[in-house]
Design a protein with these regions (language model features):
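Glycine-rich phosphate/diphosphate-binding loop of Rossmann-like nucleotide-binding domains
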Residues: 1-22, 133-224
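An N-terminal-biased, well-structured beta-alpha scaffold segment characteristic
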Residues: 1-83, 87
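Short, ordered loop/turn segments at secondary-structure junctions
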Residues: 14-17, 39, 53-54, 73-74, ...
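Generic hydrophobic/aromatic pocket-lining and core-packing "Φ" positions
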Residues: 24, 59, 81, 121, ...
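A structured beta-alpha segment of the ubiquitous adenosine-cofactor-binding alpha/beta core
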Residues: 31-46, 53-54, 200-252
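Glycine/serine-rich phosphate-binding loop and adjoining beta1-alpha1 elements at the start
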Residues: 56-146
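Rossmann-fold NAD(P)-binding glycine/threonine-rich loop
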Residues: 74-103, 240-270
């Protein structure tokens, strides 16, 4: 409705709303024109709004001088930028919106990260072999699950809150010591590294850590791995591939039946 008030005609691929329980009729009633295929949508639209950036199969469908609003990750996707440049496409990279109060209403990255953090715990729970919360039964005692969340940004904090509410013992690590208060306020334990320099960067983001810091970090993770049932990694560095924090060495130290959920997989994985 807000877009239509600006004078735009809205188009939607048929069936696109079904995973969110919105039928084509719901959109038609709201004045949206339904098109039969994604190809037709690309052909008939001047402005494309989508969550993920254009896939390789979609590059050929882009029209000259088309406008795309999406997550682009320009620092990691030079080939995509080159392809868009050849098409003379105007791009708004939603992942590049600064973390400031004035831009908060446009912070699509944080809203998606919040969903991802919640969903990470739900998916881990569906694969885990027992309840998150501890139980005392006539047959004996079942200990609560121990969950480690690496990275306490929006996704990490959402995962911490969800896991805590489900009765798990939650530990969290972040290279930025200033997030300790947020983690502890949610009932989780903050794993602190005794180090003179940290990984705090500008705008609340992390920055690449020193070799000495990484060495201490790996030592901490080696201590935690045998105890932890579920690891959820969320660490990202703007404009760079995701840092490698939980390699095969850590996985091998974990108990049989343990779960690893890597929310940074799209950017190279933690």
């Amino acid at each position: 409705k807000q877009i239509q008030k600006l004078g735009y005609t809205c188009l939607l691929e048929t069936g696109a709303g079904l995973p969110s329980n919105f039928s084509d009729k719901d959109y038609k009633d709201a004045g949206v024109r339904i098109v039969k295929s994604a190809s037709q949508l690309w052909k008939d639209s001047e402005v494309i709004l989508k969550v993920r950036g254009p896939e390789k199969s979609e590059i050929s469908k882009i029209q000259p001088n088309q406008h795309i609003i999406s997550f682009i990750w320009p620092g990691q996707n030079k080939s995509l930028l080159d392809s868009l440049n050849k098409k003379k496409t105007t791009v708004q990279a939603m992942d590049m919106i600064p973390r400031i109060s004035r831009a908060q209403k446009m912070d699509a990255l944080s809203s998606m990260a919040n969903i991802a953090g919640y969903r990470a715990v739900i998916e881990a729970g569906s694969q885990f072999g027992r309840f998150f919360t501890g139980q005392i039964t006539a047959a004996g005692k079942v200990p609560p699950a121990k969950i480690l969340v690496i990275g306490a940004g929006v996704a990490g904090l959402a995962a911490i809150g969800t896991a805590q509410s489900m009765g798990a013992i939650v530990r969290a690590f972040d290279v930025r010591p200033e997030v300790a208060e947020q983690i502890e306020s949610m009932g989780a334990e903050f794993l602190m590294l005794d180090f003179t320099s940290d990984g705090s960067g500008e705008g609340g983001y992390a920055k690449p850590a020193s070799k000495e810091f990484i060495k201490k970090e790996m030592e901490l993770f080696r201590e935690q791995a045998p105890e932890i049932d579920i690891v959820i990694t969320t660490a990202l560095i703007p404009g760079m591939p995701a840092p490698k924090l939980w390699p095969k060495e850590m996985v091998d130290l974990m108990k049989p039946g343990s779960i690893v959920v890597d929310l940074a997989a799209e950017q190279g994985g933690n």
